[in-house]
From Swiss-Prot:
Role noted for this protein: Binds directly to 23S rRNA. The L1 stalk is quite mobile in the ribosome, and is involved in E site tRNA release.
UniProtKB keywords: Repressor, Ribonucleoprotein, Ribosomal protein, RNA-binding, rRNA-binding, Translation regulation, tRNA-binding
Superkingdom assignment: Bacteria
Family membership: Belongs to the universal ribosomal protein uL1 family.
SUBUNIT field: Part of the 50S ribosomal subunit.
GO molecular function: rRNA binding; structural constituent of ribosome; tRNA binding
Name used for this protein in its record: Large ribosomal subunit protein uL1
Gene expressing this chain: rplA
Keyword DNA repair appears in the UniProt entry: no
UniProt entry tagged with the keyword RNA-binding: yes
UniProt GO cellular component terms: large ribosomal subunit
Length: 238
C-alpha cells in the first residue's frame, strides 16, 4: 500500500532539490521547512559503512552538544549511601537505591536518563527488559555507569547525548531544536560529525559516511555534503 503524503509535506518537499547542500544552507532550509504546529527537533540521519552484527563494526558513544539540546532532561540516579546525597546535591530529579529499583520495576519511568554507580549494576541488571527497549539501560560506553555522579548529571543536563548505530548501520540523532539559529545547529552538527569520525569502528571498511541527511521532525529530508562539514572550522560556525 502506498503511503499517502500530506499536502503540507509535498509542498515542503518541493523546496528541497535532489542534491547535496552545504551545511549552513541545509540547516537554513531545515528551519524553513519546520512548519508543524509544535516545536520540532532538528534530526540527523546518517548511513554508515558498517555492519553492526560484527562486534568490530558497532558504534555506540556519546556526544556533548555545545549549544545544548533545547530540551529539559530529567535525570534519575541509582546509587548507595553518600552517592545518593551527591546525586541530590548535583540536581538529579529522581534518586535512590534499592527502593528506586523497586519503583522502576513497578512501572516508574518519569525520567529521560538513568545513571547508576558500578556497585549497584548487578541489581539494576534485572531491569534490563524494562529499560533496554526504552534506551534507558545504564552502560559504561554511554557514560551512565560511573562513580562521578555530579559530572555525569551536569553533562547530560547540559546537552550530552548517547547514540548508537542501529542494526542496519544507520545513526538517528536529535541535535537541537528547529528553533535554534542555523549557526547554533551547525556548531552541534559539527560536534556530532567529529564524534562519529573519532569513534570510527576498527572493522569499518571502505567509505565510512554513505549518506547524510538532516530534517525537522515533520519536515523533508535534506542531503548534506559531509566533506564540506568536515572542512568547516568551528570558528566559522560559532
Amino acid at each position: 500500500m502506498t503511503k499517502k503524503v500530506s499536502r503540507r509535506l509535498r509542498e515542503l518537499q518541493a523546496k528541497v532539490e535532489d542534491r547535496e547542500y552545504g551545511p549552513l544552507d541545509a540547516l537554513s532550509l531545515l528551519k524553513e521547512t519546520a512548519t508543524a504546529k509544535f516545536a520540532e527537533a532538528a534530526e540527523a540521519h546518517i548511513r554508515l559503512g558498517i555492519d553492526p552484527k560484527y562486534t568490530d563494526q558497532q558504534l555506540r558513544t556519546t556526544v556533548a552538544l555545545p549549544k545544548g539540546t533545547g530540551q529539559i532532561v530529567r535525570v534519575a540516579v541509582i546509587a548507595r549511601g553518600e552517592k545518593v546525597t551527591e546525586a541530590s546535591n548535583a540536581g538529579a530529579d529522581v534518586f535512590g537505591s534499592e527502593e528506586l529499583i523497586d519503583e522502576i520495576q513497578k512501572g516508574r519511568m518519569d525520567f529521560d536518563k538513568l545513571i547508576a554507580t558500578p556497585d549497584v549494576m548487578p541489581q539494576v541488571a534485572k531491569l534490563g527488559k524494562m529499560l533496554g527497549p526504552r534506551g534507558l539501560m545504564p552502560s559504561p560506553k554511554g557514560g551512565t555507569v560511573t562513580f562521578d555522579i555530579a559530572s555525569a548529571i551536569a553533562e547530560f543536563k547540559a546537552g550530552k547525548l548517547e547514540f548508537r548505530a542501529d542494526r542496519t548501520g544507520i545513526v538517528h540523532v536529535m541535535f537541537g531544536k528547529a528553533s535554534f539559529s542555523p549557526e547554533d545547529l551547525l556548531v552541534n552538527l559539527k560536534a556530532l560529525q567529529e564524534t562519529i569520525d573519532r569513534n570510527r569502528p576498527s572493522g569499518a571498511k571502505g567509505r565510512y559516511w554513505r549518506t547524510f541527511y538532516v530534517s525537522a521532525t515533520m519536515g523533508p529530508s535534506i542531503r548534506v555534503d559531509i566533506n564540506a562539514l568536515r572542512d568547516y572550522k568551528l570558528t566559522e560556525a560559532a
